[in-house]
């Protein structure tokens, strides 16, 4: 069916006392992203013309964290219930648009479920998302007559008979803007909590003869809210299990799906293998036949075909061409670039550095602010000294250079093609093509040398 224009209201004013945190509840993260951002993203994908965010506690921190100029920020100075929160947003509703109500602490709601709810909304009526629970205690119970939804009774206000009703309200609903404003204006706080319940609009709509269509989510976990860290941790595991399942079904080999975390977006080629305890953050692309060892962290990086990253390596904001090998225990920091066939071994760190085709840095090395050519050997213990205490400087190493172990290159410095730098050398001046450079303290031999003896 053809949907009306739609705006979304996200309720995010709660303090989250049971989180025991100075951070507003909706800013606590799931899969590396604030809970409320998951909800905002769902609203955006659904095609919301406007997203109204109702905030209260921690408003400044919310604005600093989300930094979204497309949000309409609506202050709820006093937390007097969900109906009161919607009343604060009501002046922004257009009469001819639909209004979808979501919650900033219900992060797993899916676009697919929301689209079904949107499609099911009757003309002039309400679309209501409900679930059935074995134990409905503490929730708002759905009342029906002859199968039709007639209202919602909060648990504290319900009779013993009503408390046995297993179908409960999730709080997510959609209605026309003009209708919603009219119903909101009629809400009262005559209940056990002394609050304005948004759920009371269901009875108001029924009294007007409007139809209420109840829709169930694909998974109950989509409507699970978060009130404490235990609940958040459970949703994290549900979310990660779902992501792992999608990857496995798309052909990615996760050696232990229960020990894999995706905290962003992952694009994979064919025959990718990922070992246990790997964390993917941000936007990551893995080419064909990539292998990621146990305990690695990959963030905002592109990994080319046939690359292998050995265990406990960290790759952040880096770009690897085909057939590169990394680690174990390597660290690629932002700006690291490896051309085809390059190798970075154990305890090697790169930052804003380019390692050419077939070049190798095998052990215990720091390469920062450096441009390194093709077929270069970087010996163990090599350091590019890029910082003078105030500014950073660049090291340039040409093709086919051999850098011996324990070499320091004091930037700015350039080493020409084919040059050889002897072990233990400190390079402070430019080196011409094909030169041999060495700087060592003369070796001294003392015959009959006696070691010092400790005093008794």
From Swiss-Prot:
Protein name according to UniProt: Bifunctional protein GlmU
Q: Which UniProt keywords apply?
A: Acyltransferase, Cell shape, Cell wall biogenesis/degradation, Cytoplasm, Magnesium, Metal-binding, Multifunctional enzyme, Nucleotidyltransferase, Peptidoglycan synthesis, Repeat, Transferase
Annotated segments matching region Pyrophosphorylase: 1-229
Family to which this protein belongs:
In the N-terminal section; belongs to the N-acetylglucosamine-1-phosphate uridyltransferase family.
Taxonomic path: Bacteria, Pseudomonadati, Pseudomonadota, Gammaproteobacteria, Enterobacterales
Which annotated residues bind Mg(2+)?
105, 227
What the entry lists under CDD domains is as follows:
GT2_GlmU_N_bac (cd02540), LbH_GlmU_C (cd03353)
- Its Enzyme Commission number(s) read 2.7.7.23, 2.3.1.157
What does it do? Catalyzes the last two sequential reactions in the de novo biosynthetic pathway for UDP-N-acetylglucosamine (UDP-GlcNAc). The C-terminal domain catalyzes the transfer of acetyl group from acetyl coenzyme A to glucosamine-1-phosphate (GlcN-1-P) to produce N-acetylglucosamine-1-phosphate (GlcNAc-1-P), which is converted into UDP-GlcNAc by the transfer of uridine 5-monophosphate (from uridine 5-triphosphate), a reaction catalyzed by the N-terminal domain.
Q: Where is this region: Linker?
A: 230-250
Q: Which GO terms describe its biological process?
A: cell morphogenesis; cell wall organization; lipid A biosynthetic process; peptidoglycan biosynthetic process; regulation of cell shape; UDP-N-acetylglucosamine biosynthetic process
Binding positions (UDP-N-acetyl-alpha-D-glucosamine): 11-14, 25, 76, 81-82, 103-105, 140, 154, 169, 227, 333, 351, 366, 377
Q: In which pathway does it act?
A: Nucleotide-sugar biosynthesis; UDP-N-acetyl-alpha-D-glucosamine biosynthesis; N-acetyl-alpha-D-glucosamine 1-phosphate from alpha-D-glucosamine 6-phosphate (route II): step 2/2; Nucleotide-sugar biosynthesis; UDP-N-acetyl-alpha-D-glucosamine biosynthesis; UDP-N-acetyl-alpha-D-glucosamine from N-acetyl-alpha-D-glucosamine 1-phosphate: step 1/1; Bacterial outer membrane biogenesis; LPS lipid A biosynthesis
**Per UniProt, where does acetyl-CoA bind?**
380, 386-387, 405, 423, 440
UniProt KW Isomerase keyword: no
UniProt superkingdom: Bacteria
Copy out the cofactor comment. Answer: Binds 1 Mg(2+) ion per subunit.
Catalytic activity from the UniProt record: alpha-D-glucosamine 1-phosphate + acetyl-CoA = N-acetyl-alpha-D-glucosamine 1-phosphate + CoA + H(+); N-acetyl-alpha-D-glucosamine 1-phosphate + UTP + H(+) = UDP-N-acetyl-alpha-D-glucosamine + diphosphate
Quaternary context: Homotrimer.
Q: Which Gene3D superfamilies match?
A: Hexapeptide repeat proteins, Spore Coat Polysaccharide Biosynthesis Protein SpsA, Chain A
Q: Which cofactors?
A: Mg(2+)
